[in-house]
A protein has these predicted regions:
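Accessory interaction regions appended to the cores of large information-processing enzymes
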Residues: 1-311
Length: 311
């Protein structure tokens, strides 16, 4: 069982961290992690009874009020077609100002894709992203419109927006960016100006490129008695699962399915109830796949409301 744990009182975060470290030293069957991606502390334990024991210890021994939530889903963002964006950053407030203008094209990246069509490719950086997927950054500038010394700053701006995607703030992946034109000023152009221009040009293009939200899909293996196969398969299908196969393993049948992670919350309890505790399962990450349009729309709306509140 995995849950998100947080303190009820905002000033107790450090106390909760200390309590979790103490519990980890006492109990090797539990562990926790602080996820910078979904901004939650995740508590992993053996089941609901184990979770209740841990909660009792935190509340009665460590004297902390805590709450448990459903873990957020680590979505990804990408694009489905080619688009272009441009942005001029200009700021003047006495003395040297800030100026940069960037034109770029973005495309969905795939292995073996040809060079950018209609552009003069001068150099290319292939970046393996920490969160999976790639960013291909191409210098296609001709005529010295932008000094090459500013390209790393444009890349920084692109990367910053890919770490906080335009749709839901999720990581973006598998995109080729080709910078092909722009303008600079002898005095006012600097690294921060081109970083800002690159970020906004990329964001503009991303929104125009039919962006797609991706969700993690997990391979789920369920081991159950033969007479319970129908019920287990039916339950997996209600969770948007796609059953891929079934085979005998000893006295059990192994059912293999691909299921969205968002549908697997509290599956351990559901499976135990469905099979009277006679089944077990494993699950591991498989791939990312597009979410349904309605799901994407709702998540984008929620993100927009959150950003308004933050502002």
């Amino acid at each position: 069982v995995t849950v998100a744990i947080s303190s009820v009182n905002k000033g107790d975060e450090e106390k909760l961290s200390n309590a979790l470290h103490t519990l980890r030293e006492e109990d090797a069957s539990m562990h926790f992690e602080v996820s910078s991606e979904i901004k939650q502390t995740l508590l992993h334990c053996q089941g609901e009874l184990h979770l209740k024991v841990l909660q009792w210890k935190i509340e009665h021994i460590h004297k902390l009020d805590v709450k448990f939530d459903k873990p957020k889903i680590p979505y990804r963002e990408t694009i489905s077609r080619k688009a272009e964006g441009n942005y001029r950053h200009k700021k003047q407030s006495g003395g040297a100002g800030q100026f940069a203008e960037v034109y770029l094209r973005i495309e969905p990246w795939y292995d073996g894709m040809p060079n950018p069509e209609g552009l003069n490719l001068r150099s290319k950086d292939e970046i393996d992203l920490d969160w999976g997927g790639k960013l291909i950054f191409c210098n296609c500038i001709v005529g010295g419109a932008i000094d090459t010394r500013f390209l790393p700053s444009i890349l920084k701006g692109v990367m910053e927006k890919m770490q906080n995607g335009p749709l839901t703030g999720s990581y973006a992946r598998d995109i080729r960016v080709s910078v092909y034109d722009g303008k600079m000023h002898d005095v006012d152009s600097n690294d921060i100006s081109f970083k800002i221009a690159g970020l906004h040009a990329f964001r503009q293009a991303f929104i125009e490129a039919d962006p797609q939200l991706l969700e993690p899909i997990y391979t789920v293996e369920v081991f159950c008695p033969d007479e319970m196969v129908g019920a287990v398969m039916g339950d997996l299908q209600t969770r948007m699962g796609v059953v891929e196969g079934m085979q005998a393993e000893g006295h059990f049948e192994k059912i293999t399915a691909k299921v969205p992670l968002a549908q697997m919350h509290q599956y351990s309890s559901s499976l135990r109830s469905l099979t009277q505790g006679r089944a077990r399962f494993n699950m591991f990450f498989s791939s990312y796949a597009p979410v349904a349009y309605e799901v994407q729309r709702k998540l984008m709306e929620a993100h927009s409301k959150h950003e308004v509140l933050q502002d």
